[in-house]
Amino acid sequence: MPLNLPRHLPAIEILKRESIFVMDDLRASAQDIRPLKIVLLNLMPVKIATETDFVRLLSDSPLQVNVVFVKMKEHQSKNTSLEHLMAFYKNFEDICEENYDGMIITGAPLELMNFEEVTYWEELQKIFDWASKHVTSTLYICWAAQAGLYHFYGIPKYSLAKKMFGVFQHTTNGSNVPLFRGFDSEFYVPHSRYTEIRKEDILKVPRLKLLVESKESGVHIVSARCGREIFMTGHAEYAPNTLHNEYQRDLDKGIQTEIPKNYYKDNDSTKDVLVSWVAHANLLFKNWLNYYVYQATPYDPKEIEFLEDLNVKE
């Protein structure tokens, strides 16, 4: 997908080296088409890596996508320079008067805190409520999925006895769901978290549909409003070395984290990473953009706020 990104965004050069086509805003402005407008609310501390992960997955389609990066106003980043944030990010108040075709809300390393203890919880709730009316389809990732399910549907999260860490096998609960068109019957997804949401709580809420789960890592994808809200507890967007970097970081901090499961060849951290999730991750995001964004969004963005559920069969 030709992505319209701000000139000089670090992800552009990284992805060009991977032979992924992106265009800057100067070239994109010369194309006389209605681009899809996607918001990326980046809650992660190291923002450049997260930007690159998601931009990589939003690429490789004939449609043009304008990506707008948004940060929390009530949080001061310690791991991303102010210069980068000033150059490439907006605050919520800068975009709240517009409608968008799609939105991605990333995870955040806040799992062991109560939601109400998060310094920007009130601001985040306002963004959740805004997205439910002003965005055609929103992906909530990892902690954001837990936060969104709690905010909208009262679903609690539970602490795990140990970190869910590795790449786990998953199956879908509906072969005809457009989000999984072209998927194999079993596929792998990385997880890295200390908390979980539980199947029995999801099944108590009629408006929620459990789409993907794993025998080992539990609930992965839950849908609401026929795909206007999609909650994903795993990290399909992770680059090959992300879990390795997290593992080394934990060891450097003296945290006795177990080796990520199903990740290294022969489960040996001195050997190569076995990349088993990237093909399905790319297909997942292509399907989301096609069936839940491009085919579902009105041509006139003003009509987005009048949508109820999407007309997507699940």
From Swiss-Prot:
Catalytic activity line of the entry: L-homoserine + acetyl-CoA = O-acetyl-L-homoserine + CoA
Principal EC category: transferase
Active site, renumbered: C142 (acyl-thioester intermediate), H235 (proton acceptor), E237
Segments forming a coiled coil: none
Keyword check for Repeat: no
GO biological process assignments: L-methionine biosynthetic process from homoserine via O-succinyl-L-homoserine and cystathionine
Site (Important for substrate specificity) location in chain: S192
Localization per Swiss-Prot or TrEMBL: Cytoplasm
Annotated metabolic or biological route of this protein: Amino-acid biosynthesis; L-methionine biosynthesis via de novo pathway; O-acetyl-L-homoserine from L-homoserine: step 1/1
Record Pfam families: HTS
Annotated positions for site Important for acyl-CoA specificity: E111
Keywords, sorted A to Z: Acyltransferase, Amino-acid biosynthesis, Cytoplasm, Methionine biosynthesis, Transferase
Enzyme Commission number(s) from the entry: 2.3.1.31
Role noted for this protein: Transfers an acetyl group from acetyl-CoA to L-homoserine, forming acetyl-L-homoserine.
Family to which the UniProt record says this protein belongs: Belongs to the MetA family.
Protein name: Homoserine O-acetyltransferase
Species whose genome carries this gene: Azobacteroides pseudotrichonymphae genomovar. CFP2
Source lineage: Bacteria, Pseudomonadati, Bacteroidota, Bacteroidia, Bacteroidales
Gene: metAA
